[in-house]
Amino acid sequence: MVNLLAAYADRPEPRSVAVVGNQPLPSDPQRAKAIDACDLVIRVNGFVVDKPGEEVVGSRTHVVVFNRAIRATPYVFQDYRKRLYLLVEPGRMHWEPEDVPGWWPADLGAVPVSNREVVLPLSDALGLPTRDEPTWSTTGTLAAWIARTSFPTAQLVLTGFSFIDNPDQTSWEHAAGDSCIVGPEHQIAAEGRLLDSWTKTGDTTLLR
């Protein structure tokens, strides 16, 4: 997967990678510029990007990490032929069906993310018994894990991860304007601790 990600980045060996979660954020020109300045920008599920004149989360997207429950936004499949789409499917280990929604582009060419190589190692790092029980990380943390493990020497920029500051929430708002409960399969407090620990290493920056 590393070579595939690198093929979509601005340079073969990205020096900076941004992973943008879907927490609603206030306008911040410096944040938006920092995201768009990265060699590789990864967004998640039903994401949004800045419209002309906005300065919130930037406008560039190289990679989309998503799941079958993705919510439609105007940006999800915009310019999809120019992006890499990584389909995470941890639920396939338990109850999730193989079918994909009919509204996805027929020629999307999404690449499945390996449960064995990606999902389970992350679950181990989080202390989640995913092999035996239907519990796994959010798609956002999976995207961050993919970025960190694929490019361990790159500067990682994280933003839009509400559970780092609010690990006890039971529902959350999305930047696209919708909201939902935190799925019972997720343990967001553990995810928040993991991502927060990365910010102490000097090579990961959290932009609030």
Where are these regions (language model features)?
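Metal-ion/cofactor- or nucleotide/acyl-coenzyme-handling active-site neighborhoods
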Residues: 1-208
